Regions:
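ATP-binding/phosphotransfer module of carbohydrate and carboxylate kinases, centering on a glycine-rich
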Residues: 1-175, 286-289, 294-434
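A short, glycine/Asx- and small/polar-enriched loop/turn
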Residues: 85-88, 189, 239
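Short, acidic, Ser/Thr-enriched surface-loop or helix-capping motifs
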Residues: 117, 189, 258
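Glycine/GP-enriched mid-protein hinge/lid loop-to-helix segment characteristic of carbohydrate kinases
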Residues: 125-127, 136-155, 202-203, 209-326
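Gly/Ser/Thr-rich active-site cleft segment
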Residues: 176-207
Length: 434
């Protein structure tokens, strides 16, 4: 006699205590608002800063005094009022002659250490391939048998060891205030931890602790997508300041979302995990198997590894993704065709994100969109075909403001974002102010 089937056990209802607390929203101090206004509009008179920020003239005068005391801004030459009448103005602007920030970015195949000034300009960078050693599931982007990457702590200590020489050769007497660190996948900025980076084989790596011990600098940690979205807010086009989606397409594919100027992190630091959006193969060839076991995921179709594999299938054998890009830039039709196919798939993903979030701007961080006009046109055309809410892709979908220096910008932008949010915070290299 058959037993009656046991009914499926219903999952216990989710309790509030089961959900990790979300990190605090980014709150810009009054002094931070003044510093950002000076960044955007300087050299600018204090009276204009008051109008730009909505703060009282007396408050602005106090904030500017603190910023001058910390050496973050400087005064320019006295100028007459706009009509030649009234009191003269002494404009203020960002002082780029005293301080720098350092940046570090870890990609799948290489790492980058950089220096940036307080206007977000890259002063110097040093990119090195990873040393091979401990095992890891995606040691290369070329599809060879993975031999693994250096362990997380060892790689981070190598980054720290490379920084002093960069400072010695390029700082020109300026003091480094802090180190910003960025990488892909899930990063918890409040804890300073890389929660999970499957391509590197990293899980719960205490980046801040390791780098602060190794460098003696304050260390700020975030995902590269959020870092680049913050860089767009600070130093990019004005249209990217308030409501932005940023889509990063490289060896890793992920995204960042900003609303009312604040980045959305998520309670598990997982906001922007778009790698497994199911998009299919774009109608050309079989879909690339994904690490998740499915086919047609966004990352498995458009990642650098997938691009190099597809090139080999077409008889175009290249040693790296960079070599494939060089071919496309030089006019190789097969290489260009691969980037145009990629642009269509990225456009399909962009259309989904536009319909989900309806941002003012969607920034695409992808070298084809940034350097190959045909690819940007194809991407925008695909958005026009597929998005229900985007009625002007030419205005809404834009390439990165940092094409050519994306990874060098990402790490430093983490530190600069923290500085512009709270310039009176605990910055040991800055003079104390009351």
């Amino acid at each position: 006699m058959k037993r009656p089937p046991v009914p499926a056990r219903r999952p216990a209802p989710l309790r509030r205590s089961d959900i990790p607390a979300a990190g605090p929203a980014r709150r810009v101090s009054g002094t931070g608002s003044v510093l950002s206004a000076i960044l955007d509009h300087g050299p600018v008179a204090r009276s204009n800063v008051a109008r730009l920020t909505g703060l009282s003239p007396a408050a602005v005068t106090g904030h500017v005094g603190q910023l001058l005391a910390r050496g973050l801004v400087r005064e320019g030459a006295e100028t007459a009022g706009p009509t030649g009448l009234g009191r003269p103005h002494i404009p203020v602007e960002i002082d780029t002659g005293r301080y720098l920030v350092a940046g570090a970015h870890v990609a799948v195949a290489h790492s980058t250490v950089s220096l940036m000034d307080l206007r977000g300009r890259v002063v110097a960078e040093d990119r090195q391939p990873h040393a091979l050693g401990a095992t890891g599931p995606y040691a290369t982007v070329l599809g060879r048998s993975p031999r693994g990457l250096s362990s997380g702590p060892a790689l981070l200590r190598d980054l720290a060891d490379r920084l002093p020489r960069l400072v010695e050769e390029h700082a020109a007497g300026r003091t480094v205030l802090a180190l910003g660190f960025a990488t892909g996948h899930r990063v918890d900025p409040a804890a300073g931890v890389v929660v999970e980076h499957p391509h590197l084989g990293w899980r719960d790596v205490p980046v801040r602790e390791i780098l602060e011990t190794a460098t003696g600098l304050p260390v700020h940690v975030d995902s590269h997508s959020r870092a680049l979205a913050r860089a767009e807010q600070l130093f990019g086009e004005a249209s990217t300041r308030v409501s932005t989606v940023l889509l990063f397409v490289g060896a890793v594919v992920d995204a960042a979302f900003a609303s009312s100027g604040n980045m959305h992190l998520g309670p598990r630091s997982g906001a922007g995990s778009v790698a497994h959006l199911p998009l299919g193969s774009g109608g050309s060839g079989g879909a690339e198997p994904c690490s998740c076991g499915r086919t047609g995921c966004l990352q498995s179709e458009v990642s650098e590894r997938a691009m190099v594999r597809r090139a080999a299938e077409q008889g175009l054998f290249v040693g790296s993704f960079a070599e494939l890009l060089d071919g496309a830039l030089a006019g190789d039709e097969r290489a260009l065709g691969l980037f145009r196919r990629r642009a269509l798939l990225v456009g399909r993903a962009a259309a989904l994100l536009l319909d989900m979030f309806d941002p003012e701007v969607l920034v695409v961080v992808e070298p084809g969109a940034g350097r190959l006009p045909e690819c940007l046109a194809d991407l925008r055309a695909e958005v026009a075909r597929r998005s229900w809410v985007c009625d002007d892709p030419e205005r809404t979908v834009v390439p990165s403001s940092f094409t050519g220096s994306v990874l060098a910008t990402a790490g430093g932008a983490v530190a600069l974002g923290a500085l512009y949010d709270d310039p009176l915070g605990p910055w040991p290299a800055l003079p104390a102010v009351s």
